[in-house]
Amino acid sequence: MLKEIFIYTLKCLLYFWCPFGRASRKEYAYYNNTTLVLALLVVAAIKYLPPHKLEWLYAFANEFKVALCCICAIVVLASYSVLVRRGHDLGYNWFSTLFRSSECMMFKGWQFNRRLFKEEGSSLPNEYGPAPEENR
């Protein structure tokens, strides 16, 4: 199970530059849940560090701020990429997917995001490519 989660997360991070094709429910859910858990672990670790360790962390972050910004940018781009590819699996174009998911901050976007997690994609090829292995 952990190996499978690691593989799907790594696949999303490697395909961060490619918002075309289709992503299965499993790939979308594993990537989003993994990034959420890792972000919560980092925040919890920072919150409970003693003050003398925080100074070391600030020095490290200041020294490697360009690298940390690049890592954060790759994670964010990978999130958008897997979101668009999941929308392609359900037949939505990239603009429609990004617009509907950004409504999450407002009123009805949570319904669309729930649909991305729950609705199964088609097992047939569509205009965005062949079906992912999990849909067949």
Question: Which residue ranges define each predicted feature?
Answer:
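Hydrophobic alpha-helical transmembrane segments in multi-pass membrane proteins
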Residues: 27-53, 58-83, 90-118
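Membrane-interface extramembranous regions at the lipid-water interface
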Residues: 1-34, 80-95, 114-136
